[in-house]
């Protein structure tokens, strides 16, 4: 019995450590990338040169099956796009993309919203000259 309790305690600590590495309790990964291949982000970035006109936002969603999430693209406090996803399983990978004009330089953000509009996570990137 003592060994079982130690095992359970160890597993709980391990899970807690892993969960704390996630950006949000329901988001295990959220990154900007230059491309998506085989449902995975390729060339993860934090900023983008304005000679490149497209960026992807990839999110690995956990334990929200049956719910909807939205990627909301924001530039200069203006909503530029909402992309809605239906989450079909306990681990669901989604991504959206945005075509960018070279003049739209500055800080962009993407919010990951729950179905009721709660911001689950927000991430920024710089679009530079």
PLM region spans:
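Positively charged n-region of N-terminal signal peptides that target proteins for export
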Residues: 1-4
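Conserved aromatic beta-strand anchor motif in extracellular beta-sandwich/beta-rich domains
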Residues: 71-75, 112
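Extracellular Ig-like/FN3 beta-sandwich strand-entry sites
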Residues: 66, 103-107
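Short, exposed beta-strand-loop hairpins at the edges of beta-sheets
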Residues: 100-101, 109-127
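Short edge beta-strand/loop segments characteristic of extracellular beta-sandwich folds
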Residues: 54-62
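Short, compositionally biased P/S/T/A/G/V-rich stretches that sit at domain boundaries
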Residues: 20-51
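Aromatic sugar-binding surface patches on proteins
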Residues: 88-97
């Amino acid at each position: 019995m003592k060994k079982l309790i130690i095992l359970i305690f160890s597993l709980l600590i391990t899970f807690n450590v892993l969960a704390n590495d996630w950006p949000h309790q329901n988001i295990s990964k959220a990154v900007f990338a230059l491309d998506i291949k085989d449902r995975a982000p390729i060339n993860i970035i934090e900023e983008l040169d304005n000679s490149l006109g497209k960026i992807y936002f990839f999110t690995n969603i956990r334990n929200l099956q049956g719910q909807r999430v939205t990627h909301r693209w924001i530039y200069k406090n203006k909503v530029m796009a909402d992309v809605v996803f239906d989450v079909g399983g306990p681990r669901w990978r989604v991504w959206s993309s945005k075509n960018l004009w070279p003049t739209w330089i500055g800080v962009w953000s993407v919010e990951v919203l729950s179905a009721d509009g709660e911001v689950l996570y927000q991430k920024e990137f710089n679009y530079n000259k």
